[in-house]
């Protein structure tokens, strides 16, 4: 799509050189054929370093745009990006008249399974009844897909993975832009989900696709039932994520992190290797590895327990007055 066509679609003024835009991408990863955006002061430091062909940016930051990057000036780059994401969204279901599928002869596929176009299914894979396998999905050798699992387009699943009943892999993330009237506009997610080898995903768990790039669950990680993992998360090797945990978008867990039941992160943060978050712990900042944390606001678990004891003693003393 031509940059002039994008400007017209967004009702923006553009009189520069017309160029072809192939896709949308993040500020630092966009290349010379892609369009990106910058919204707010937090990311302005990255504008001079973008390699994008074009950028949606507010007037006040136009001077930071590199000379080889075309600027589309907008009052709300995030909202303009949301509108544009729909224009670049991939089709949910292939319109190909004949599907191309590479399914190993040893794979076992039970009744009422939908398999999309350009799907690769490895040796000794088992796909149980009612599963949905979208376009461009790959499933590694000896993986087991339980009943009614949904695997959306472009998902990559490694070897010997277990996906338990009713889990959903690769659905759109929870991302919206807002106008001045408080109305919400969907951001279409064009990334994917990657599950590396030996990953287990529990029943009724959901893992959202990335806006760009991939949501990644690394090798050996085990995810319990009823867990939510948001878009663009990066979960390290051999993590344990217990039921009803919520991991917000762009959270990064190191290797062998344990998230206790009903714990959560607030997103865009890092938890170091070999950390443990106790049940119901609320993580709202980066955490050093190798320690046990708990409570909210998050702190060392031993300090949280001491605090609870002090509160209980103080309450008891006051009740006796």
From Swiss-Prot:
The keyword Acyltransferase applies. InterPro entries: Hexapep, Hexapep_transf_CS, LpxD, Trimer_LpxA-like_sf, UDP_GlcNAc_AcTrfase_non-rep. The active site is at residue 231. Pathway: Bacterial outer membrane biogenesis; LPS lipid A biosynthesis. SUPFAM superfamilies: Trimeric LpxA-like enzymes. The keyword Transferase applies. Signal peptide: none annotated. GO terms for cellular component: membrane. Belongs to the transferase hexapeptide repeat family. LpxD subfamily. Homotrimer. Catalyzes the N-acylation of UDP-3-O-acylglucosamine using 3-hydroxyacyl-ACP as the acyl donor. Is involved in the biosynthesis of lipid A, a phosphorylated glycolipid that anchors the lipopolysaccharide to the outer membrane of the cell. This is UDP-3-O-acylglucosamine N-acyltransferase. It comes from Campylobacter jejuni subsp. jejuni serotype O:2 (strain ATCC 700819 / NCTC 11168). The lineage of its organism: Bacteria, Pseudomonadati, Campylobacterota, Epsilonproteobacteria, Campylobacterales. The gene is lpxD.
């Amino acid at each position: 799509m031509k940059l002039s066509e994008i400007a017209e679609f967004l009702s923006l003024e553009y009189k520069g050189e017309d160029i072809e835009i192939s896709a949308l991408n993040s500020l630092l990863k966009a290349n010379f054929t892609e369009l990106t955006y910058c919204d707010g002061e937090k990311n302005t430091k990255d504008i001079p370093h973008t390699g994008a062909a074009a950028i949606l940016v507010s007037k006040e930051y136009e001077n930071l745009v590199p000379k080889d990057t075309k600027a589309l000036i907008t009052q709300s780059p995030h909202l303009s990006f949301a509108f544009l994401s729909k224009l670049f969204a991939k089709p949910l279901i292939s319109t190909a008249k004949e599907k191309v599928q590479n399914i190993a002869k040893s794979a076992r596929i039970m009744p009422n399974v939908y398999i999309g176009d350009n799907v690769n299914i490895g040796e000794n894979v088992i796909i149980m009844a009612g599963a949905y396998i979208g376009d461009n999905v790959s499933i590694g050798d000896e993986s087991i897909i339980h009943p009614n699992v949904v695997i959306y387009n472009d998902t990559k699943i490694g070897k010997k993975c277990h996906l338990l009943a009713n889990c959903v892999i690769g659905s759109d993330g929870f991302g919206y832009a807002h106008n001045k009237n408080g109305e919400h506009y969907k951001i279409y997610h064009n990334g994917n989900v990657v599950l590396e080898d030996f990953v287990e995903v529990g029943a009724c768990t959901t893992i959202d696709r990335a806006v760009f790039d991939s949501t990644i669950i690394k090798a050996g990680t085990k995810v319990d039932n009823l867990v939510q993992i948001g878009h663009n998360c990066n979960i390290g090797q051999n993590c344990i994520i217990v039921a009803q945990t919520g991991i917000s978008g762009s959270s990064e867990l190191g290797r062998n992190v344990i998230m206790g039941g009903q714990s959560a992160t607030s997103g865009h943060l890092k938890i170091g290797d070999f950390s443990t978050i106790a049940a119901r712990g609320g993580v709202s900042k980066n955490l050093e590895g190798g320690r046990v944390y708990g409570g909210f606001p998050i702190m060392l678990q031993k300090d949280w327990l001491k605090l609870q004891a002090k509160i209980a003693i103080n309450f008891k003393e006051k009740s006796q007055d």
